Design a protein with these regions (language model features):
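Glycine-rich, aromatic-flanked loop segments that form ligand/cofactor-binding clefts
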Residues: 90-126, 130
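Conserved, mostly hydrophobic/aromatic
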Residues: 3, 28, 51, 89, ...
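Metal- or metallocofactor-binding catalytic centers and their adjacent structured scaffolds
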Residues: 24-100
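Shared catalytic-loop signature of beta/alpha-barrel
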Residues: 51-53, 65, 203, 209-212, ...
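Ligand-binding pocket scaffold of soluble enzyme catalytic domains
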Residues: 21, 27-32, 62, 100, ...
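Metal-dependent enolase-superfamily TIM-barrel catalytic cores that perform enediolate-based chemistry
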Residues: 116-231
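Proline-centered loop/turn at the N-terminus of a beta-strand
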Residues: 104, 118, 183, 235, ...
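Structured beta-strand/loop patches that form or line metal/cofactor-binding pockets in enzymes
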Residues: 1-32, 36, 320-326
Length: 327
């Protein structure tokens, strides 16, 4: 079996861009992948087409070999655009391989470690009561965990003391709304640059027993995050903006996090995520993949989560209506 073409489909259905990748073979099999939207999405599409020239005529089942061709073909270590493009192609290759063998992809990854995957939903709202109402809705939908930004939306334009008070009120309102049997994760979305301030937000939220504290600082600042990790007393989660085993090796070595959150549409693909998970397992860390993109990403994450022993929980985007639901 040989690769005969690789196509891209850039679509926008109202929630942002989606870049789908289609790998076509000479045996009437094709695979579908998706590349993460990193911002310059047209450039990601062009990167896929650039990589295609190296893959035409190759055996699509040699995924490790083809990954090395794509990654090593860059003179310098790749950034978000290259790794998003590689991820989209790599995921499509797994789709081809699963179809060729007539088995679900998770069977090619070692088989099932579990029968169910725990998920959480993001919640939000302008006021503490809005957050509480959305949290109650999530619980009524069957979720046993939710994630929220503890800080108010206008946190950059109000006094810091007020940010801390409002953060405590928001998390308290959600805890009171859902009770003690629902986990609450916190995600300031890497908006805090100063270690001391991130620690202060964590301290005012700690009484409400957060499941984890995500992107507590800028994700490239492993040293600052490691310093925070030593003091915080809440599990730190990060990794959505990082890619490849090489960056995650440095993250793990810095002892900056307890929970790793690679995005399979960005980190290098499914096999790269499995390698990251194996390193994490050896260091007694757990995995909670970043998954905000939609149904394709959720399907891919399903194969990863069901076959990964140190999986913790999966982000899940619930679309009850609109274009994404129809998709």
């Amino acid at each position: 079996m040989k690769i005969t073409d690789i196509l891209t489909y850039g679509v926008n259905i109202g929630d942002g861009n989606h870049i789908f990748v289609k790998v076509i073979t000479d045996e009437h099999l094709y695979g579908i992948g998706e590349a993460y939207r990193v911002g310059p999405d047209l450039a990601v599409e062009q990167t896929v087409h650039y990589l295609k020239e190296w893959l035409i005529g190759e055996d699509p089942t040699r995924i490790e070999h083809l990954w090395r061709i794509m990654y090593n073909g860059s003179r310098f270590p790749g950034g978000s655009m290259l790794n998003a493009a590689i991820s989209g192609i790599e995921l499509a290759l797994w789709d081809v391989k699963g179809k060729a063998h007539g088995v679900p992809v998770y069977q090619l990854l070692g088989g099932r470690c579990r029968d169910r995957i725990r998920v959480y939903r993001g919640i939000g709202g302008g006021t503490p009561q809005d957050c509480a109402n959305d949290a109650k809705l999530a619980v009524s939908q069957g979720f046993t965990a939710v994630k929220m930004n503890p800080m108010p939306g206008d946190n950059a334009s109000i006094p810091w003391g007020r940010v801390l008070r409002e953060s405590a009120k928001r998390v308290e309102a959600v805890r009171m709304a859902v009770g003690d049997e629902v986990d609450i994760a916190l995600d300031p979305h890497a908006e805090i640059f100063e270690t001391v301030r991130s620690l202060e937000v964590a301290e005012v939220c700690k009484p409400y027993r957060p499941l984890f504290y995500e992107e507590a600082l800028r994700p490239e600042n492993f040293q600052a995050m490691a310093s925070l990790h030593e003091k915080i007393g809440i599990p730190i989660a990060t990794g959505e903006m990082n890619y490849t085993k090489y960056e995650f090796r440095n993250l793990i070595a810095s002892r900056a996090a307890d929970i790793l959150q690679p995005d399979l549409l960005l980190c290098g693909g499914l096999m790269e995520a499995k390698k990251i998970a194996a390193m994490a397992e050896a260091h007694c860390l757990t995995m909670a993949p970043h998954n905000p993109m939609g149904p394709y990403s959720t399907a891919v994450c399903g194969h990863f989560c069901i076959s990964t022993p140190n999986f913790l929980i999966l982000e899940y985007r619930l679309d009850l209506d609109g274009p994404m639901r129809n998709l």
